[in-house]
Amino acid sequence: MVAFPLFHSKDGLIMKHIHIIGIGGTFMGGVAAIAKEAGFKVSGCDAKMYPPMSTQLEALGIDVHEGFDAAQLDEFKADIYVIGNVAKRGMDVIEAILNKGLPYISGPQWLAENVLHQHWVLGVAGTHGKTTTASMLAWVLEYAGLAPGFLIGGVPENFSVSARLPQTPRQDPNSKSPFFVIEADEYDTAFFDKRSKFVHYRPRTAILNNLEFDHADIFADLDAIQTQFHHLVRTVPSEGLIVCNGQQQSLQDTLDKGCWTPVEKFGTEQGWQVGTVHADGSFDVRHHGETVGHVTWELMGEHNRMNALAVISAARHAGVDIQTACEALSAFKNVKRRMEIKGTVNGITVYDDFAHHPTAIETTIEGLRQRVGNARILAVLEPRSNTMKLGTMKAALPASLNDADQVFCYAGGVDWDVAEALAPLGSKLHVGKDFDAFVAEIVKNTEAGDHILVMSNGGFGGIHGKLLEALK
């Protein structure tokens, strides 16, 4: 058993059993896994569960209650309730917790107080690419023998779990690793704490990957997000390191508000750069104009090469030399739901990707295009995120989807006029609200050699399996 201190309330009571409200989310599911490994009794509740998190929780033997009813409080009788940001006032379970005066805490605060405060935290922040970049960074440290803990919003193929405590490093079998890699999310913490999650983490090494407007349901504009990112910058110690995308003016503007930490930039001649990109997808790594390494991998897109530069810089801060980092990246396997091949039937390949913001959609299609050349790409989109449902980003969607040969957008559950917003795509656009008819329309328009790229941040009704079955 890992010797972690149990959480104590202010009156000295030991909080051994935690019950997680919203346990099915990628972050809270990761908190559950870490708490279980640390010796806590863990249970939780959520409305709907999707793989891979549902599979992970089941494998860990964690009891999950379906729904947010108040009766579960008597069923589980937890010592403290860890509240995810899916929870809202008005939910029966939340009102009961408040009315009964039961102890509660947010997921990020629980993690910070019980795990992170003891470790060298490496935080990966940015509007896009957090999960992939955090997975790369955790793997590079693992490959180097540093055995980090991590909590990532997806399941890295190199690890098969989304979260774990620090393990025994190769160099010192009598200790535990000091390193912990975390996906540092800008979304708000909980209904009672509207600060971004990452404010709780206090990283010693922070990657700022990119910054643009997103999460229109909680942020009024880009300035509001920049304010939260600057709160993160304020928490990085002067002996730490900020690794920053040098191509993003929005990040430079954030640093200009005040920065007390050394900064290394990537994507610029003054820092880390992608050198020659070879036909097989491998690329050279340059630092201050000099070629210092080479990465051979199968990942698609310039965005992933930029992610790699950030990881090499951050890993070097933790003591990993450049060559070892490049070797590790060459052995990196991507995260589930990041351009994940779900199957191939009759020469037609179906992919699954988490992309749900115009920039991420565009770079995902661009990456696939680089891989498949002139073969047809059928983009299948579910506008499911809160920002997408509000229609805040609808004007940017046509350009982001333009490189696809055919575009299929599922309009079920969306209040804005999808056909009107995506009209610039012309005859290659297909919009549907009936799910079964939507699947049939995709299949009708396929031909051998096609690549069907499904993009959603939810389960999308199991569309991948339905497509593969219908294509037989």
Where in the sequence are the language-model features?
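BRCT (BRCA1 C-terminal) domain core and associated BRCT-interaction motifs
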Residues: G67-I80, N85
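Generic structural signal for helix capping and beta-alpha/helix-loop junctions
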Residues: P52, D74, N114, N158-F159, ...
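Beta-strand->loop->alpha-helix junctions that form or flank phosphate-binding loops
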Residues: H65-D69, G107-A112, L151-G154, G258-H278, ...
